[in-house]
């Protein structure tokens, strides 16, 4: 009899738990789910920041990545390599999220096959390059400055021409991309456009 009463009491508690226990349980479950979600979200974010992810589609691997492999950003005497995300993904969280949202448009064009052949890519190269240059100009070449900084430069260790250009650029308030277009990827064809209007008068790519 006592056992039956005990079972009924337990059943009632399960059917109508105390508000105190309900709130505590919900908070615990919410916390655990939040930790799992945040962990999964950050894992996914980091996975999309790997160079292997960037070149997982052939448009990147077969075109711009092959160009990049021939540049000083890929192989140099110091062994320091700037990978795709180093140059194209901000490190600060807010700006990184904004860039990830923008990337959804690139996924759409991947599906549409906008640049899925060399011919299509070359036809769009100038537009794509200008989009990147405009963005870098707007952010004062923020990603370049993760590795390069005027204040940290030892002008005495640079060649005379580099000292002159960097000094003039610093005095004129120029940013990296003003002079260094085409340093990591081939420049677009400028046959039908004014080169100075696209590259700027001071471009030293």
Please annotate each region the language model reported.
Residues 2-205:
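Short sequence/structural segments immediately N-terminal
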């Amino acid at each position: 009899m006592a056992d039956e009463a005990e079972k009924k009491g337990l059943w009632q508690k399960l059917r109508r738990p105390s508000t105190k226990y309900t709130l505590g349980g919900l908070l615990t479950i919410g916390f655990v789910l939040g930790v799992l979600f945040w962990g999964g979200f950050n894992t996914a974010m980091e996975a999309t920041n790997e160079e292997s992810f960037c070149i997982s589609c052939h448009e990147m691997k077969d075109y711009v990545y092959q160009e990049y492999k021939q540049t000083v950003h890929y192989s140099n005497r110091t062994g320091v390599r700037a990978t795709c995300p180093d140059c194209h993904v901000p490190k600060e969280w807010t700006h990184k999220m904004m860039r990830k949202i923008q990337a959804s448009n690139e996924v759409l064009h991947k599906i549409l096959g906008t640049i899925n052949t060399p011919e299509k890519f070359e036809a769009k190269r100038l537009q794509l390059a200008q989009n990147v240059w405009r963005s870098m100009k707007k952010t004062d070449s923020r990603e370049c400055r993760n590795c390069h900084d005027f204040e940290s430069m030892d002008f005495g260790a640079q060649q005379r021409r580099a000292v002159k250009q960097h000094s003039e650029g610093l005095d004129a308030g120029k940013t990296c991309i003003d002079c260094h277009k085409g340093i990591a990827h081939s420049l677009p064809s400028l046959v039908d456009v004014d080169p100075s209007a696209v590259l700027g008068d001071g471009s030293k790519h």
